[in-house]
């Protein structure tokens, strides 16, 4: 028996699947969303775009936009008493409503 793989997409089968109605690429508006520094955002991974995708442990977490890195945003998230800095494309973010 070989050793079990624990890669980046480990245990993400349901998390990275879409319903038939949601299948396909996202709209251009979703790809080009804009956020301001200081905005609260929720990490909501878009499975059809792997580029700029955060790890699944951050799915559903709320963070604050701290700046830009090219097309992506620098997002700070509190996790386990520490602040994590993520570089995430806007297609994987949505505004926090709370």
Curated annotation (Swiss-Prot):
What protein name does the entry list? Large ribosomal subunit protein eL21
Q: Name one GO molecular function term.
A: structural constituent of ribosome
Q: Whose protein is this, by species?
A: Korarchaeum cryptofilum (strain OPF8)
Extract the Pfam families matched here: Ribosomal_L21e
Q: Mind telling me which Gene3D superfamilies this protein's record contains?
A: Ribosomal protein L21
Q: Which UniProt keywords apply?
A: Ribonucleoprotein, Ribosomal protein
Family of the protein in this entry: Belongs to the eukaryotic ribosomal protein eL21 family.
Q: Name one GO biological process term.
A: translation
Which cellular components does GO assign to this protein? cytosolic large ribosomal subunit
Tell me the first and last residues of the signal peptide. Answer: none
């Amino acid at each position: 028996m070989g050793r079990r793989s624990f890669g980046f997409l480990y245990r993400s089968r349901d998390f990275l699947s879409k319903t038939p109605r949601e299948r396909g690429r996202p709209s251009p508006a979703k790809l080009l969303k804009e956020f301001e520094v200081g905005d609260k955002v929720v990490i909501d991974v878009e499975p059809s775009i792997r580029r700029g995708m955060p790890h699944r442990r951050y799915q559903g977490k709320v963070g604050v936009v701290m700046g830009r890195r090219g097309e992506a945003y620098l997002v700070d998230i509190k996790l386990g008493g520490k602040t994590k800095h993520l570089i995430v494309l806007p297609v994987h973010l949505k505004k926090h409503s709370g």
